[in-house]
Curated annotation (Swiss-Prot):
Protein name as annotated: Vacuolar histidine transporter YPQ3
Swiss-Prot/TrEMBL keywords: Amino-acid transport, Membrane, Mitochondrion, Repeat, Transmembrane, Transmembrane helix, Transport, Vacuole
Induction pattern: Up-regulated during histidine starvation. Up-regulated by addition of ammonia or amino acids to a nitrogen-depleted medium. Down-regulated by excess lysine.
Free-text function comment from the UniProt entry: Amino acid transporter that moves histidine into the vacuole. May also contribute to low affinity arginine import into the vacuole. May function as an amino acid/proton antiporter.
Length: 296
């Protein structure tokens, strides 16, 4: 394969954006699936959000097949549906485990009976009189706890910086992979910006277009339950930041590369919804070390 210089025109920029979009959508579900597995919980995710997204992907697959799109596009749509199913299974499985644990706890816990109050005797009065003596080790213990909390807080700050750096590397790697994959096809002559003979006009498949619009509506509406859940909890804990970041990047690059009304509505609309979730991430974000200091 011979390396050739890139001609920066609208077609090549569109192809590059499309390649980046595909790479983002390939990995978009991985961070959230991993987050659920790591926490052994999907409590932060709205079940309705996953269900609506799944229905949108199902209509997307059906529309792509009816419109006779490229096999790669159909395979990608099927892959998204499979990833949705994995998230849905995680939500249902971890919720079932949580309920079973709560039921087990209720069975094993006996009613609490308060013991009768101990009478104040001479020993108690003596302890009160000499209170300054037992307070000394208690003060030292509190100082020790405060110091350990500060140390833990510093450790968490370092860990958060490491996570940010790791996220930056992951996002950069996906973007570079998208550009490189496009450049390989560009050098191979598959996408070199040279005008090709236009294919004959393809008749629009009305049922496929209807499915495309339905898919767009479902994509657009799927974010609303998640936004509402985050608002009620005043937290985005349990939701992967990279999940929505890759969704934003995928939709943004897709909008740049495609000019099809039904799919643009879905991408542009969900992009606005994803930005709303981003605002919630920063609005509800509280440094973990502050929580620890407050608790202690």
């Amino acid at each position: 394969m011979k390396l050739i210089p890139i001609i920066l025109n609208a077609k090549n920029l569109s192809g590059m954006a499309g390649s980046i979009s595909i790479c983002c959508w390939i990995v978009v579900f991985v961070p959230q699936i991993y987050e659920n597995f790591r926490r052994q919980s999907a409590e932060g995710l709205s079940l309705l959000f996953i269900v609506l997204w799944l229905l949108g992907d199902i209509f997307n697959v059906m529309g792509a097949m009816m419109q006779n799109l490229l096999p790669t596009m159909i395979i990608l749509a099927a892959y998204y549906t499979l990833a949705d199913l994995i998230l849905l299974i995680q939500c249902m499985w971890y919720d079932k485990e949580k309920k079973s644990i709560l039921q087990e706890v209720k069975k094993n816990v006996d009613p609490v009976h308060l013991p009768p109050a101990n009478p104040i005797n001479e020993t108690v009065l003596q302890d009160v009189f000499n209170e300054y003596e037992p307070l000394l080790p208690r003060i030292e213990e509190e100082d020790s706890q405060s110091y350990s909390s500060l140390e833990l807080g510093r450790t968490i700050v370092v860990k958060e910086r490491e996570n940010f750096f790791n996220d930056f590397l992951i996002v950069s790697g996906v973007l570079i992979a998208g550009i490189l994959s496009w450049y390989i096809s560009y050098c191979s002559g598959l996408d070199n910006g040279i005008p090709k003979k236009k294919p004959a006009f393809e008749q629009i498949n009305l049922p496929a277009q209807i499915l495309g619009y339905l898919s767009a509506i479902l994509y657009l509406g799927s974010r609303i339950p998640q936004i509402v859940l985050n608002f009620k909890r005043k937290s985005c804990e349990g939701v992967s930041f990279l999940f929505f970041l890759f969704a934003c990047l995928g939709n943004t690059s897709f909008i740049i590369s495609v000019l099809s009304a039904s799919w643009l509505i879905g991408s542009a609309g969900t992009l606005l919804m994803d930005f709303t979730v981003f605002i919630q991430f920063f609005l509800y974000a509280k440094p973990k070390y502050e929580k620890i200091l407050i608790d202690n």
